[in-house]
Design a protein with these regions (language model features):
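A structural micro-motif
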Residues: 5, 28, 76, 98, ...
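Amide-donor transfer/coupling interface in amidating biosynthetic enzymes
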Residues: 1, 109-158
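Fold-independent oxyanion-binding glycine-rich loops
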Residues: 12-13, 33, 49-51, 81-83, ...
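Flexible, glycine-rich phosphate/dinucleotide-binding loops
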Residues: 16, 39, 87, 94, ...
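Cysteine-nucleophile active-site neighborhood
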Residues: 51-124
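Rossmann-like NAD(H)/NADP(H) cofactor-binding core
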Residues: 8, 79, 134
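N-terminal beta1-alpha1 cap of cysteine-dependent amidohydrolase-like domains
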Residues: 1-61, 65-74
Length: 158
């Protein structure tokens, strides 16, 4: 069953195919965002895991950065995982770069260690059920900006 929404999945680098396949298995129409012209008619966006520095660089080189930033700032719904969170964050505590800066949080890159230190852990999601999380050089949300306490909600903690 199609939702009628077209979801753009950033496909310049990272774990985009897993997101696209899952959304398509749920009946969603997805488009891989590889160039600026792919952005024009999307109704929502997925920013996947990967390497945020590379993604930010490629978004600028492909002239996609400014349009995506503007669409996000104007309310385009976004699901962001790992590097996607870093791209959205307004502050990165251990990096001088800021990318879109549209999510009023401070994050720490690679907060859970190096690639070889990857692990899985169980956490409670939205006080309703337990689920397994995988940490692979994952970022950590250190703080939610005071001005956004009513707009940003923590769904799970580890």
């Amino acid at each position: 069953m199609k939702s009628g929404l077209k979801i753009g999945v950033l496909a310049v680098q990272g774990a985009f195919i897993e997101h696209k396949r899952m959304l398509e298995s749920l009946g969603c129409e997805c488009v891989e965002l590889r160039q600026k012209s792919d952005i024009c008619d999307i109704d929502a966006l997925v920013l996947p895991g990967g390497e945020s520095t590379v993604q930010g660089k490629l978004l600028r080189e492909l002239d996609m950065f400014d349009e995506l930033k503007e669409r996000i700032a104007n309310g385009l719904p976004v699901l962001a995982t790992c590097a996607g969170l870093i791209l959205l964050a307004s502050h990165i505590s251990n990096d001088d770069n800021v990318y879109f800066g549209t999510l009023p949080v401070t994050v720490k890159r690679n907060a859970y260690g190096r690639q070889l230190g990857s692990f899985e852990a169980t956490a409670r999601f939205d006080n309703s059920f337990d689920f397994t999380m995988t940490f692979i050089r994952a970022p950590y949300v250190e703080a939610i900006d005071a001005s956004a306490k009513n707009d940003v909600r923590v769904l799970a903690e580890y």
